[in-house]
Amino acid sequence: MGCRCCKIIQSYLFDPVQVPSPGYVNEVNSCKLDEDDTDKLKGKWSSEVLVQKNDPQRQGSKKTESSSRTADPWEPCWPHQGPLPQGDAGGEHHACGVNGIGPAATPQPTGNSSPTQDDRGSWASTANTVPPTQPFLEGGGTRKQDCVLLASEGTQVMRNGDSRAPSEAESFALEVQDHVFQIPAPDYLQHWGPAGDNVDHNEKDCVFKNHTEDESLEGIQPPVGEHGLNTPFSVRRSWDSLNEDVETEVLSICFNEKGPVHAMPVVDSGNRQEDTHGSDGDGDGEIVDEDAAVAEALAALEAATAGEDLDETD
């Protein structure tokens, strides 16, 4: 019992690999592979294939033994061992089992039909997208399985309406908006558009204000010598007082040049000015008083000049 054939027979008897029925194909595909069991089974299958390749004469006995075991209803069916594929290197091979199930698949319990799940994820959401006849690949084929699973997970996420993809698209759109160039405002004054209209309106308002101020000043301050009944009482009073002051100064200068005899009209005019400031009469009365004062001043001047003429003639 120390030959290789006996060891292989013992491995078949004590370490059987259960092959599920065709009804459990999808469930077996939905199960996750166990890495430890995969490594063990891969070593066993590689050793068995090498033994069969080196000893082709013993294949007949293996076939008879396998057929006798398949006849027993209490023992599971064993997959037929084939030769090593030519394209594999380093002892790795692709094993195709019954119904497209590889020998590395772990047995599925008949009592529990729900898929298992661990920390590395589950195949339950992606197993239905994989065809049931697709074999599990060993060695270099595991990378292809990972790629297929990643692609199927991406499609499952998009079908379930996950918000991850829209959020990434929105963030990309926001980044594009942040990189949009903004044109700075010009430094020069623009005389077109709303800004130019505002400038024109401001200038027009300033011009109109200046005109109104000039007109108001002209209306409030009439030129010297213009005294009418249409002007306000306070304005006429101020201009009358100013004119009287000028006239009294002129008369006082004339009388000082002529002599001290004619000082009386100046005093009278001063008293008359105080009377005009203190009185609240009508403008007509003030104008009459002013005319009387002027007449008196002219009479005094004529009398003075007449007296001088008489002195000269004497």
Curated annotation (Swiss-Prot):
The modification Phosphoserine is found at S30, S238, S241. It is a peripheral membrane protein. InterPro entries: DUF4699. It is found in: Cell membrane. The modification Phosphothreonine is found at T106. Residues 107-116 have a biased composition (Polar residues). Residues 36-142, 267-291 are annotated as: Disordered. Keywords: Cell membrane, Membrane, Phosphoprotein, Tumor suppressor. Residues 271-280 have a biased composition (Basic and acidic residues). It comes from the Eukaryota. GO terms for cellular component: cell periphery; plasma membrane. Interacts with KEAP1; this interaction prevents the ubiquitination of KEAP1 by TRIM25, thus protecting KEAP1 from degradation. Found in association with PDCD10 and members of the STE20 kinases, such as STK24, STK25 and STK26. Acts as a tumor suppressor. Acts as a tumor suppressor for colorectal cancer cell proliferation by targeting KEAP1/USP17/ELK1/CDK6 axis. This is PDCD10 and GCKIII kinases-associated protein 1.
